Amino acid sequence: MRVRIAVIGKLDGFIKEGIKHYEKFLRRFCKPEVLEIKRVHRGSIEEIVRKETEDLTNRILPGSFVMVMDKRGEEVSSEEFADFLKDLEMKGKDITILIGGPYGLNEEIFAKAHRVFSLSKMTFTHGMTVLIVLEQIFRAFKIIHGENYHY
């Protein structure tokens, strides 16, 4: 199972270190990949959002299950997320997770998404969102495989 996370913006060094940390642990469960998509700096906010959404859409793995991380999404427990991931794994589905830029995503992407999740009612930087998503994927696989996941 391939898990691609595509995020708008350049990630800080400490975030990249965290990504390496989780990628190392995740490799026994899946093939993780984080793609940094260059931010758009020119144009109106609407034009920026449209172009960034288009750039994210172009990074969707063919035939994959598309998840969008957005504050309007559904909040689930780690156990519920593990059940969801297990179902996708059993179906042999790859996953593409999309994380928008500071202005968010346009509505087109929500029509392409199979599921929209929110991590919290709080707001996180895009880099922190990537780390939290990777941690939750790792936690989900530990739950799926009956391994201890409390550290």
UniProtKB/Swiss-Prot annotation:
Q: Name one Pfam family in it.
A: SPOUT_MTase
Q: Which UniProt keywords apply?
A: Cytoplasm, Methyltransferase, rRNA processing, S-adenosyl-L-methionine, Transferase
S-adenosyl-L-methionine is among the record's keywords: yes
The record's section on InterPro entries has: Alpha/beta_knot_MTases, RlmH-like, tRNA_m1G_MTases_N
Q: Where does S-adenosyl-L-methionine bind?
A: 100, 119-124
Q: This protein's superkingdom?
A: Bacteria
Compartment(s): Cytoplasm
GO cellular component terms, semicolon-separated: cytoplasm
Q: Describe its assembly.
A: Homodimer.
Record's function text? Specifically methylates the pseudouridine at position 1915 (m3Psi1915) in 23S rRNA.
Please name the HAMAP family in this protein's record.
23SrRNA_methyltr_H
Q: What's the protein name?
A: Ribosomal RNA large subunit methyltransferase H
User: Which organism's genome codes for this protein?
Assistant: Thermotoga maritima (strain ATCC 43589 / DSM 3109 / JCM 10099 / NBRC 100826 / MSB8)
Gene designation: rlmH
